[in-house]
Regions:
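N-terminal, post-signal-peptide region of Sec/Tat-exported proteins
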Residues: 44-84, 88-89
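Positively charged n-region of N-terminal signal peptides that target proteins for export
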Residues: 1-4
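Mature soluble domains of exported/periplasmic/lumenal proteins and thiol-rich metal-chelating peptides
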Residues: 29, 33-37, 59, 65-69, ...
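Bacterial Sec-dependent signal peptides at the C-terminal "C-region" and cleavage site
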Residues: 16-27
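Stable alpha-helical elements in mature extracytoplasmic
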Residues: 39, 46, 63-66, 98-102
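Bacterial N-terminal signal peptides
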Residues: 8-16
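Local sequence-structure signature of Cys/Sec-based thiol-disulfide redox active-site neighborhoods
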Residues: 26-53
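Thiol/selenol-based redox catalytic cores and closely related redox-interacting motifs
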Residues: 72-156
Length: 156
């Protein structure tokens, strides 16, 4: 009886350690501060996408005038703006950028201010709609002068 109890206890402890280690790895990714509107459901879905990709995400809900000031402060050109802004490791991420493209940005470290998915294209992370065909969209880089360049074409 004591042996069965010890085996069961060992299984529980091992499983608990594995779960805790997995949580630690998930939160150990790059830290992202997301500035968004409290009423934007698609932004909340994008935050979930980022967390699921291993990013440590902190969210600040702002009123629209403050959100626009943040976009200006982080150098997002008007032509590249979307619904949320997220500084990460010295870069600015604007809109529904896939986590894979953010990881690429952090690995390559191009000489840009940031990357953006202008607008809210269907099929981008957080903008998935059941029964609606996703649209191809561009991920853009932007520089200090506000010039944009296609970084990648997404075909969900």
């Amino acid at each position: 009886m004591a042996r069965k109890l010890m085996v069961a206890l060992a299984v529980v402890v091992t499983a608990s350690v594995a779960v805790l280690q997995g949580q630690g790895k998930r939160a150990a990714g790059p830290s992202v501060d997301v500035f968004k509107s409290a009423t934007c459901g698609c932004c909340a879905k994008w935050v979930d996408h980022m967390r699921n990709a291993g990013f440590a995400v902190h969210v600040s809900d702002l009123e629209e005038p403050e959100l626009q000031k943040i976009k200006g402060r982080y150098g997002v050109p008007a032509s590249a703006r979307s619904c949320h802004t997220a500084p990460v490791e010295g870069f600015t991420v604007e809109g529904h950028v896939p986590a894979s493209e953010e990881k690429r940005l952090l690995k390559e470290k191009p000489a840009v201010v940031g990357i953006a998915v202008p607008g809210m294209p269907l099929g981008s992370p957080g903008m998935e709609v059941s029964g609606v065909k996703p649209h191809p969209y561009n991920v853009l880089t932007f520089d200090k002068q506000g010039a944009t360049t296609v970084y990648s074409v997404q075909k969900p």
